[in-house]
Design a protein with these regions (language model features):
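Cytoplasmic-entry segments and transmembrane alpha-helices of multi-pass inner-membrane transporters
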Residues: 26, 40, 138-147, 224-263, ...
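Interhelical loop and adjacent transmembrane-helix boundary motif
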Residues: 67-107, 137-141, 167-198, 359, ...
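Transmembrane alpha-helix signature in integral membrane proteins
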Residues: 102-116, 197-231, 239
């Protein structure tokens, strides 16, 4: 299950690394007597190792963060233990102890991974030529197509088909809508949307509100961090950026507990002071509103937005900065008049990635959501936990549809970069 869902993390980064490798390096290995397979193992694979390790790290972090899948299949994990201790037993101290233990394990993995790459550097020539394509013959062509298509079939086509069958089957057997009173068992796409009941749109609006709030804030913070590092590339700035983007390596349940405890104490202290001074109750001003959710989302997904923003900013040559200063522009004017227009594609990608991650985030939302503020992800989880799979199919398909956005954007960017290299 996790392999089919998380393999794109490794695939996308590895594909980019292999595509950017110069064919001159591989040709040099061939001139030294290496076969194509030996050249791949001894030259291409080591050069792509940082990207592959980064993809594996992302997949590992996502596995540790997962709650819905392991809960549905009844697999006892650390995240499950944190949820049951916090929400089921009300033991905050024990839940925080489990969170600290899990966080220590993650920190150890990060340290070991960085130590394994100590003093290892991989460079390649800037002289790039288009690699020669190997033309597969006879049955090898169909075997390659089958192997490449297998993850798509197992990880996308079959699950989507099953969800569609569940919707159709539930309508034909119960003559009711899978998520309410709408009649769309045999409806067209327009009739389907028109007959989707209000509760579904409420969950969709909640998800959309949280995502559209967190995404632009994350992009703005990422711009500030990346531009600050560009202007003052000091160790302090680098340390601040590493600290700010560490949240993606931390499971959502741990982030939720780490944010909920101080925000809750602040709310209690503020409420007590307001009661004593003005006889007014402020209630859960921060921890009981979407402010806490958005804050946790920013901690969790800032690294996603920062990566895209930093990559776009690094593609802008420093000569443009010098030219703008020679024309009398200050750093702020340079950012808004030169950098941001050139970074538009990267900014859009960053916003979309954060938007989709927030839409499908479950652990943080389950713990920190305000009362009666369920999202599509929470709705799917609750229905699936009750074995009401047909009712969970429509919101699940909605999340899948939103999740296709970054896939389309990244595919377009990869195609554009390949065309540019060929010209």
């Amino acid at each position: 299950m996790f392999v089919l869902v998380l393999y794109p993390y490794v695939y996308l980064l590895a594909r980019s690394a292999f595509s950017n490798q110069s064919s001159i390096t591989l040709e040099a290995s061939r001139s030294l007597g290496c076969t194509p397979w030996q050249g791949f193992l001894k030259v291409a694979l080591p050069m792509a190792r940082p990207a592959i390790v980064a993809g594996l790290s992302l997949a590992l972090m996502e596995t540790l963060n997962d709650y819905g899948t392991v809960e549905f299949f009844a697999v006892p994990t650390f995240t499950i233990g944190i949820f049951r201790t916090w929400l089921g037993q009300g033991e905050r101290a024990a839940a925080m102890q489990l969170a600290v233990l899990l966080l220590s394990f993650i920190a150890l993995l990060v340290i070991l991974e960085r130590q394994s790459r100590t003093r290892q550097r991989y460079y390649q020539t800037n002289q790039t030529t288009e690699s020669k394509r190997y033309q597969l013959q006879s049955w090898h062509q169909w075997a390659a197509i089958g192997i490449c298509g297998l993850p798509i079939i197992l990880g996308f086509a079959i699950p989507v088909s099953v969800l569609a069958v569940l919707i159709k089957g539930d309508r034909s057997t119960t003559n009711t809508s899978p998520i309410g009173d709408g009649d769309y068992g045999t409806a067209t796409s327009g009739e389907f949307l028109a007959n989707v009941p209000d509760p579904f749109w409420g969950y969709a609006i909640h998800s959309f509100t949280l995502a559209t709030t967190a995404a632009p804030i994350a992009v703005i913070i990422a711009i500030i961090l990346a531009y600050g590092q560009r202007l003052q590339p000091s160790k302090l700035n680098r340390w601040a950026i590493q600290s700010a983007t560490l949240g993606y390596a931390i499971p959502g349940a741990v982030i939720a507990i780490g944010a909920m405890v101080p925000l809750g104490k602040f709310d209690n202290a503020l409420d007590s002071w307001m009661r004593s001074q003005f006889n007014i109750s402020t209630g859960l001003l921060l921890s009981g509103t979407i402010f806490a959710l958005v804050f946790a989302y920013l901690v969790r997904f800032l690294a996603v937005g920062y990566g895209a923003v930093e990559s776009s900013l690094n593609n802008i040559k420093p000569n443009l900065d010098n030219a703008s200063r020679s024309l009398g522009l200050n750093t702020t004017q340079t950012l808004f008049q030169i950098h941001l227009p050139l970074m538009r594609g990267g900014l859009i990608s960053a916003a979309i990635l954060v938007f989709v991650d927030v839409m499908k985030e479950l652990p943080v939302t389950l713990i920190m959501r305000p009362l009666n503020y369920d999202t599509l992800a929470v709705r799917v989880f609750n229905l699936a936990s009750d074995e009401r799979l047909a009712e969970a199919a429509v919101p699940a398909l909605a999340i899948i549809a939103v999740g296709l956005l970054p896939v389309l954007v990244l595919s377009w960017q990869m195609g554009t970069s390949i065309v540019k290299r060929q010209h």
